[in-house]
Amino acid sequence: MAIIVEDGSFITSSQWENVEASPKPPPRKPKIVQPKKKPSKHLSNEDALEKYEMLFGERRKEVELDYMSHIAEEETSLSMIEYDRHFALQTDVKLSKKRKSKLVEMTPKGLKKRKRVQIQEGSVSTNTKKRMDGHVVGSSAPAINNGKGKQLLEMMGWSRGKGLGSENQGMVDPVVAVVKNNKQGLH
């Protein structure tokens, strides 16, 4: 017959008799077990930095070297100092213009400058008058003969000149927009 002792080991009955007769051993020190870290979705700052350097470290150096090859030699030291925020220098106008022109040349060929939209002369009316208080806006607008809103209203039983509802008690005329030039807000 086997007996299980507190520490989880198996001993036989003859061993148990010897254990009872012998003095108890000194208590063991408990082992400190570090809790296992669960793998997280996000990297720690150190891990992220290492991964970034592995992925982009070489490419970044290549880009910097490529950029430096396009800059004139007299501008190299200035551009490196200007790159640092703490030592921003006011450079000569000619040098800054040269640098801007070189950067424009370095843009990818696929990107094009935006074209300005030309306004047609007849599309904008120049004789717009300032409207006075109480002037009704849109009264001369043509009636809408087709549209989603009109179709929905007709499906509910509406027809021109009648109100909406079972007894045609709703508004017959459209809502009128009236100009209010004063700055008092809504009334």
UniProtKB/Swiss-Prot annotation:
Question: In what residue span(s) does the G-patch domain sit?
Answer: 145-187
| GO cellular component terms, semicolon-separated | cytoplasm; mitotic spindle; mitotic spindle pole body; nucleus
Protein keywords:
Cell cycle, Cytoplasm, Cytoskeleton, Meiosis, Nucleus
First-listed, main subcellular location of the protein, grouped into a coarse class: nucleus
Q: Give me the stretches of Basic residues compositional bias.
A: 26-41
Q: Which GO terms describe its biological process?
A: meiotic cell cycle; ribosome biogenesis
What range does the record give for the signal peptide?
A: none
| Residue ranges of the region described as Disordered | 15-46, 119-145
Cite the GO molecular-function annotations of the record: nucleic acid binding
Keyword Secreted on this protein?
Answer: no
Report the domain of life of the source organism: Eukaryota
The compartments listed are: Nucleus; Cytoplasm, Cytoskeleton, Microtubule organizing center, Spindle pole body
The record, for PANTHER family, names: G PATCH DOMAIN CONTAINING PROTEIN 2
Q: What does it do?
A: Has a role in meiosis and sporulation. Required for meiotic chromosome segregation.
- Descriptive protein name: Meiotically up-regulated protein C1442.13c
According to its UniProt entry, this protein's organism is Schizosaccharomyces pombe (strain 972 / ATCC 24843) (Fission yeast)
